[in-house]
């Protein structure tokens, strides 16, 4: 991820009155990889080329324009990841545009709802590749908004947790609510409304570290080590931040343990999992949406022990998703939505969880985690003052 625009992020934030204002307007604090700071850097380092630039597209709107044979709009989903669009009215925010670069409002396509039609396909594709001249196109979106659709989580209450090197939480939102701490991001939901994306850097990175340290395989990680300890781990916690974490933004210089005693393999395995998902629960509370069901995906989702801890921490059913290429599937579903298809019908065909793999929360364990959560938050807060 490009982090070369930290100076530009600071300049944009200063110009509008601080990162709190940037976040309240755009859904995210000024982020180095987002389009706005990148445009500002381009305008500063090569002002002549910027002045000669007629139109600035995202990759999504650029390719949509190629298919339509004309400049088309940037959708609300991808447009929200630019630090330029106002979440309240879903239009370019003039304060952010002025803070970013001169005459930027003249260089951007308009914003539009994600399922807007962009017209018939270009004659080029009809003549060269045999597309039907009656083929309609819709504007494109980004990979994360399309994944939300493809995973069947476009309605508030359905939460997706993707377990990878970094763990990511996706959720639809009925209203544009922003993270008061600035860790999470808010984008437009392609099916209408809004969506959140919260990334936790130390995902499988931390789980792998514990597995290797105690010379476990994934089977023993689940069946042996995890079964040795009760929910709550008898008070033994850890912050598994092997790399500087981004949610919350803290560098602890490595993992931090709540106790000086030597952790057994069972204690360490449970500590890393409980801490990861208690941290996830803590830093998704601002969404204001209680999950009714959680879908998990990614390699670690196949591990029943990990899935059960998620179910117990959040207190809801957990399903495994079987949607390979969810962004691609979601893009196809978006095209169908643009042509008038019903979302629920599309989800029933393309976004179903694996049969017979649902895990239900254990009420006693969930109550234990409700009692542990304040202690975990206090343990985490100590690291910001130490």
For the regions a protein language model found, what residue spans apply to each?
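Carbohydrate-associated surface elements
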Residues: 2
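N-terminal entrance/gating region of PLP-dependent enzymes' catalytic architecture
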Residues: 74-77
């Amino acid at each position: 991820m490009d982090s070369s625009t930290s100076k530009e992020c600071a300049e944009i934030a200063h110009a509008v009155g601080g990162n709190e204002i940037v976040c309240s307007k755009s859904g995210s604090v000024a982020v180095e990889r987002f389009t706005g700071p990148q445009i500002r850097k381009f305008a500063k380092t090569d002002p002549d080329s910027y002045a000669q630039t007629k139109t600035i597209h995202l990759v999504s709107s650029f390719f949509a324009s190629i298919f339509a044979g004309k400049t088309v709009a940037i959708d609300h989903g991808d447009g929200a990841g630019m630090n330029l669009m106002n979440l309240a009215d879903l239009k370019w925010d003039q304060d952010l545009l002025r803070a970013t670069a001169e005459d930027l409002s003249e260089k951007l396509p308009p914003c539009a709802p994600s399922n807007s039609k962009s017209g018939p396909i270009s004659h080029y594709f009809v003549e060269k590749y045999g597309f039907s001249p009656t083929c309609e196109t819709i504007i494109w979106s980004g990979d994360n908004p399309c994944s939300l659709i493809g995973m069947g989580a476009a309605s508030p209450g359905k939460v997706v947790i993707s377990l990878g090197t970094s763990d990511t939480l996706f959720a639809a939102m009925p209203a544009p609510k922003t993270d008061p701490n600035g860790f999470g991001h808010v984008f437009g939901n392609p099916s209408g409304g809004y969506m959140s994306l919260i990334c936790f850097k130390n995902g499988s990175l931390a789980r792998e570290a514990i597995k290797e340290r105690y010379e476990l395989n994934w089977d023993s990680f689940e069946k042996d080590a995890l079964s040795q300890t009760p929910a709550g781990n008898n008070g033994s916690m850890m912050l598994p931040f092997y790399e500087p974490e981004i949610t919350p933004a803290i560098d602890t210089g490595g993992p931090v343990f709540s106790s000086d005693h030597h952790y057994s393999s069972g204690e360490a395995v449970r500590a890393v999992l409980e801490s990861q998902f208690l941290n996830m629960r803590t830093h998704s509370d601002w969404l204001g949406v209680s999950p009714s069901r959680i879908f998990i995906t990614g390699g670690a989702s196949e591990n029943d022990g990990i899935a059960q801890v998620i179910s117990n921490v959040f207190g809801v059913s957990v399903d495994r998703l079987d949607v390979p290429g969810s962004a691609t599937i979601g893009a196809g579903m978006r095209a169908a939505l643009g042509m008038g298809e019903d979302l629920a019908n599309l989800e029933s065909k393309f976004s179903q969880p694996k049969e017979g793999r649902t895990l239900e929360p254990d009420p006693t364990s969930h109550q234990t985690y409700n009692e542990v959560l304040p202690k975990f938050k206090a343990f985490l807060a100590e690291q910001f003052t130490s």
